[in-house]
C-alpha cells in the first residue's frame, strides 16, 4: 500500500515509476579495476562483490528526500528511496545519542528535544487506544518525555496564526483581483503536485501562508530558542503528523534557516509510526505516566490542551476565511455553523454568499486527487465555476484521513473509522484565532501584524519544476 497521498503518487498516465527502475538522479560510482570473472551476489544483509581476491561489501546507494523534491523525473520518487532523515529509526538514534551526552556531562553538545503534535494524530491514537482526546494527549506527552523530550507542544498557536495570515492574504488578493481564485497551501502533497505537474500556471493561485507545521518550526527554532537562550541549531524539533507528505514539506530548502544552520523541522513521524514504536516495545499509551502539554509562548495558558478549528477537519480554512471575508469585504454576518453543499461527491462541497441578488463570494472544499484534477483542469480551460477560494487537501476526507493515520481494525471500513474520528473532533473545544495568545505573538515576536517580519517568517514561495525529457523518461 502506498504511503504518500494520491496527489504525489500519480500525475499523467505515464508518470508512475519507481526510482529503482528509472530514477534520473545520477549516482557517482567509483570505478575500480577487477579481475575477469568477478560476480555479484546478494545476501540478506547487503550486496557483495565476489572475485578471486575475496569478498567486498558494496556501498549502499542513498538518495535523500531533498533529491526527490528537486527532481522532475517522477512524482513518486520519495516512496522508493531510503529516507535517511525522516524516520522513527533516525529519531530514536538522535534521542539515544542525546541521552548519552547528558549522562556523560557533555552539556555543550546536548540538544533540547522538542516535539510538536498535530490534532489529527491525537484523534487517531485516541481511537486506537480507546482514550479521550485530551487523555491521549497527556499519555502521549508522557511517552515522549520518557523517550527524552524536553518540551511537548500542540499546534494550536500555529493553527491560529495560519488562519489569521491566510484570511488576510485572501482579503488583499480579492481587493486586488477578485477574478483570481486563491487555493490553500497547507497540504504539502497538493503543493508538490502543483509544482511538478502544473508549474507556473497554478502556482500564482496558491496562498503563500505557511502550513501550521512550518509555522511551528519558526516558533520553535527562533522564539522558543530565544526564550531558552540557546541557538536554534541546538534544538532538535520533531513533529507528529497525519501524513507522510509532511516529511517532504519539512525537507524543502525553503524551510532551511541560514540563521540557525538547521531545518525548522528536523524530523517528521506519523501516527502509524508512533503506533509501531509502541508495538516494538510491546507497550500501549496507557502504560506511561501522563504529562501536560507545554505552552511556552505567552504569559497566559489556554484552558484546554487540544483544540478544533471550525467544523472542517483540515484546519478550517474555507469556513473561517469565508466568515471573515463576508464581514470584512461585504459587512455581512454569517451563522456560526456554515452549511457547505456537497456536489457530485462528499469530498467536494461549496458555499456562496449573495448580496443584492448577486453572488459576491463563492468558496469550495476539494479533498482527494480526483477532485483536485477536476478543479485544476477547469481552471486551465478557463471554465472554472468562479470560486474565490478553495481549500485543497490531497487525501479524501482531508487530514483526518491522512495516509499515515492508524489503520482500521480488521473488518472496519476506512469511511467508518473516519466518521468516528470526525465525531471525536466535534467534541473538542473550538478555537477562535482572534485571541490574546496570537496578539502577544504578533506584538512580542513579529513586530506586529502585516509587517515585513511576519511576511518573512509566516509565508513562503513555490517553485515550478521543469520536466526533463531524458531517455530514462521515455516509455516504449
Swiss-Prot record:
One of its GO terms (biological process) is iron-sulfur cluster assembly. Coiled coil: none annotated. It comes from the Eukaryota. SUPFAM superfamilies: Fe-only hydrogenase. Pfam families: Fe_hyd_lg_C (PF02906), Fe_hyd_SSU (PF02256). [4Fe-4S] cluster 2 binds at residues 187, 243, 395, 399. The keyword 4Fe-4S applies. GO terms for molecular function: 4 iron, 4 sulfur cluster binding; metal ion binding. Keywords: 4Fe-4S, Iron, Iron-sulfur, Metal-binding. [4Fe-4S] cluster 1 binds at residues 23, 68, 71, 74. PANTHER family: NITRATE, FORMATE, IRON DEHYDROGENASE (PTHR11615). Belongs to the NARF family. Component of the cytosolic iron-sulfur (Fe/S) protein assembly machinery. Required for maturation of extramitochondrial Fe/S proteins. This is Probable cytosolic Fe-S cluster assembly factor GJ13047. It comes from Drosophila virilis (Fruit fly).
